[in-house]
């Protein structure tokens, strides 16, 4: 997953985590903070990290640690989280926090009681390059469901039609 924008409550992390669960892997990683800009603060780093881990990310790859920020590198994909950053001397505190979250996030096995159909083939069928109203409406509905479930603290997985075809219901 790439988290290279400051948007909140996007479904990308949940899609990645759901995919990892479906495929039986215990790692869902996100490259994060590239393009956030030089005004990225430790508090924003923690908030974005928490938001991603709540949605199932369990390994974070911070972007980036530039050896040099000479020339275009300073503005290519800021910030550098390395020694050029004023918060560098505190980075170990953040890294230890992420390390602990990652350990806990991978130590267990996900138990989700809710599945949300992710209509991938429907999206493909409705795609019209010049008229994206149907897809925009579908995106808004999925984001609304996602936000409601996360706000209610209900864990869930997105399942596409292929994943649904191999599911079974147990105990009700």
Describe each region flagged by the PLM.
Residues 1-172:
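Carbohydrate-binding surfaces of carbohydrate-active enzymes
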């Amino acid at each position: 997953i790439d988290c290279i924008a400051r948007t909140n409550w996007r479904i990308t992390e949940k899609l990645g985590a759901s995919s990892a669960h479906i495929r039986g892997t215990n790692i869902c990683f996100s490259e994060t903070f590239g393009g956030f800009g030089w005004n990225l603060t430790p508090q924003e780093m923690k908030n974005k990290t928490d938001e991603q881990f709540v949605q199932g990310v369990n390994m974070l790859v911070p972007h980036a640690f530039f050896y040099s920020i000479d020339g275009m590198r300073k503005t290519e994909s800021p910030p550098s989280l390395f020694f050029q950053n004023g918060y560098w001397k505190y980075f170990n505190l953040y890294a230890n926090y992420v390390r602990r979250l990652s350990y806990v996030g991978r130590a267990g096995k996900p138990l989700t009681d809710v599945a949300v159909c992710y209509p991938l083939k429907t999206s493909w069928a409705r795609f019209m390059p010049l008229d994206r109203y149907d897809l925009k409406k579908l995106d808004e509905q999925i984001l609304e469901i996602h936000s409601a479930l996360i706000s209610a603290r209900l864990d869930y997985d997105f399942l596409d039609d292929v994943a649904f075809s191999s599911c079974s219901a147990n105990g009700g």
